[in-house]
Swiss-Prot record:
The gene is rplS. Pfam families: Ribosomal_L19 (PF01245). This is Large ribosomal subunit protein bL19. GO terms for cellular component: cytosolic large ribosomal subunit. Belongs to the bacterial ribosomal protein bL19 family.
Length: 166
């Protein structure tokens, strides 16, 4: 007698991939980002920055990656970074860009001023407001923690003065 067990492979993969996902800032194609990566040279490691425009985001789950393009000494250079890579230390958003495409491969043919991307001021303002709100929440939680410490100290049982010296 054979029993067949049904396994939903998509659910199984999502469960495994959740362990490998990292929290990176929310960026889109058109944004200018600075990616700090670990570079190993011989027996020492150092950090190297790559700053450019995100021209594509590909894949999903643990296979998700993004492509960054910059112009270095007059030549276009593109690098693909996996989101889940342990070699990516940090991704910093330098500037928010306003584009109407998900893939910006057309930037490869453009040069100079034609390759510029408009700044998305509304997203910049939202980011600033979110950062200010996060700062306020952090200071409020610190104040609440300090208040909780004060109440714990004042709630300690007092020892009677006549039994203190014995």
């Amino acid at each position: 007698m054979q029993t067949h067990i049904k396994i939903n492979r998509g659910e199984l993969l999502r469960g495994i991939e959740q362990d490998h996902t990292r929290q990176l800032p929310d960026f889109r194609p058109g944004d200018t980002v600075r990616v700090d990566t670990k570079v190993r040279e011989g027996n020492r490691t150092r950090s190297q920055a790559f700053e450019g425009v995100v021209i594509a985001i590909n894949g999903s789950g643990s296979r998700k990656s993004f492509t960054v393009r910059k112009i270095s000494f007059g030549e276009g250079v593109e690098r693909v970074f996996p989101f889940a890579s342990p070699l990516v230390n940090q991704v910093t958003i330098v500037e928010r860009g306003k584009v109407r495409r998900a893939k910006l491969y057309y930037l490869r043919e453009l040069r100079g001023k034609a390759a510029r991307i408009k700044s998305d001021r509304s997203r910049v303002m939202k980011d600033a407001a979110r950062a200010q709100q996060d700062k306020a929440n952090a200071s409020a939680s610190q104040a609440a923690a300090a208040q909780a410490d004060v109440t714990v100290i004042s709630a300690a049982p007092e020892v009677a003065p006549e039994t203190q010296g014995e």
